[in-house]
Amino acid sequence: MSNKHPLVQVIENAQLIERPSFAPGDTVVVQVKVREGERERLQAFEGVVIAKRNRGLNSAFTVRKISSGVGVERAFQLHSPIIDSIEVKRRGAVRRAKLYYLRERSGKSARIREKLAPRAPKVVKAKTDARVPDAVETAPGI
């Protein structure tokens, strides 16, 4: 429950940007707008989401990747205008909300299992006792 003034809530809700849903353990590619002088380009930051904070306009998430053997973490504001897009590469199966323990791990011990897609429900065919005739007769004149 928020204790914010209703007018503040309206203004904050107007600034929310639609983003894909993701969770800690997911591997994401964040396209970040980078200014170099007068030029603006997109820079991809791909890594594992180790933390996510859901607070409306103040929502944030942290992405960790290994670059040249060195761990690099970057925190992003979810609704920030410098984020061009977020693409979820793979879903990770984890049992924690914060994956800070990955900071001490490297190599195979830092791997995260992939979440399997949910199974489709089995379709059971109903047995019918009525037999379907081989040839259906039509009334003359039709």
Curated annotation (Swiss-Prot):
Matches recorded under SUPFAM superfamilies: Translation proteins SH3-like domain
InterPro entries documented for this protein: Ribosomal_bL19, Ribosomal_bL19_CS, Ribosomal_bL19_sf, Translation_prot_SH3-like_sf
Protein's GO biological process: translation
Pfam family name, one: Ribosomal_L19
Gene Ontology MF annotations: structural constituent of ribosome
Record keywords: Ribonucleoprotein, Ribosomal protein
One Gene Ontology cellular component: cytosolic large ribosomal subunit
Primary role: This protein is located at the 30S-50S ribosomal subunit interface and may play a role in the structure and function of the aminoacyl-tRNA binding site.
Identification of the protein by name: Large ribosomal subunit protein bL19
Species of origin: Psychrobacter cryohalolentis (strain ATCC BAA-1226 / DSM 17306 / VKM B-2378 / K5)
This protein's encoding gene: rplS
